Amino acid sequence: MQKMQMDTRVRRCTGEYKGAPVNGVSRKKEEHMAENFVLKGNICYSQNSRALICVEQGYLVCTDGISAGVYKELPQMYAGFPLTDYGDRLIVPGLTDLHLHAPQYSFRGLGMDLELLEWLNTRTFPEESKYSDMEYAKRAYTIFAENMKHSATTRACIFATIHREATELLMDLMEETGLKTMVGKVNMDRNSPDILVEETEESLRETRQWLADIKGRYRNTVPILTPRFIPTCTDTLMEELKKLQMEYELPVQSHLSENKGEIDWVKELCPWSEFYGDAYDHFGMFGNGVKTIMAHCVWPPEKEIQRMKENGVYVAHCPQSNTNLSSGIAPVRTYLEQGIHTGLGTDVAGGAGESVFRAMADAIQVSKLRWRLVDETLKPLTAEEAFYLGTKGGGGFFGKAGSFEEGYELDALVLNDESLKHPQPLSLKERLERFIYISDERHIDAKYVAGSKIF
């Protein structure tokens, strides 16, 4: 068999920014570079939202952190690679969480009887103010980072708080986990409690200092520009953040059309905008050459959907949070049919935990409710589609991630379902579907990120 040619240009797709180390690799961290190896087991991965590939007792080949493909028989040219045989276990791509809030991890599962804006004022903002205390931040973020390390998540886009030093601490801790993450210092200079609101110049100065402090510091962790949402950011702040975005070529994350009250509020604040997303687009932070994630997207008008498609915006679908905070049910079937980039977000603490498998199950369930109660022309999501959203769908924001196709960074989970007893044999697809609904971190035997074994 002829040796495959690998394109080294895709080997470190980490959402880099100007000032990041070359290929996202810090010179201090070079000893952690991935090796060549083969994993054997029952392998499942997505090619697209409708094509789930399952290979029984297949071989997954890794060359310098990159997938060289999945094979039923191991090609001779890889025969000398170290091989780990995982027997009857499932091997699937690592999961991507496109939206969660690290400082909210401490109150997950609380305040779920409130709607969004009340929940922010009574739960979220008081908790986030505590991160001005570095001792508290260290205790809380250490718990978060450790639990993320042992979860099924291999890549994540994370909101921190307005506090620069605590944000840098969070990035330090996430770097130690070995996961690939984008972390953002939050910007907010209006309509916020006194304990959290920044002066516009202060917000910009601290953001610039944050970017300077972390330059060249990490291999796996990169910054993402994080204006919380339009209601908490003045026009001046947004205009100046756009200049920073252009200077550092930063990706952007924020919230969009989560709640009807929020949408009305944005219309009051930005009466010149056609729709919520148009306000972001006005400031140059809505795709169109800028890698952008918008979380929720529950109530988009048709023009907003078209703009997201035209601009290549990523949707972070957060089904559990949208349910807990009574926000609504996002039209994910529409997003898939329109070809809009879509992945999943746990949205801790709007979501009660960090399980992206749980987010897959929630996405299926709420799509059934939308189909039955709102629009019977929009078919519910299938298990294959939900799995795609949690792997390749969201992984695309990081470049070539979330699949075992040749040329993709190799993020993998080894799943052990021996404890999930069944009276008869199940197909690989059936076993995977069970993991979506009833698995937890105890079923993960091994975890790899870009070819490096985490545990």
How should these model regions be labeled?
Residues 23-78, 89-90:
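N-terminal metal-binding scaffold of metallo-dependent hydrolase/deaminase domains
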Residues 48, 409-455:
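C-terminal cap of metal-dependent C-N hydrolases
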Residues 106-139, 185, 190-200, 259-289, ...:
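Active-site gating loops and adjacent loop-to-helix segments of metal-dependent hydrolytic enzymes
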Residues 108-179, 203-217:
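Alpha-helical scaffold segments that flank or form the walls of functional sites
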Residues 165-298:
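Metal-coordinating catalytic core of metallo-dependent amide/deamination hydrolases
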Residues 282-288, 333-421:
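His/Asp/Glu-enriched, well-ordered alpha-helical/loop segment
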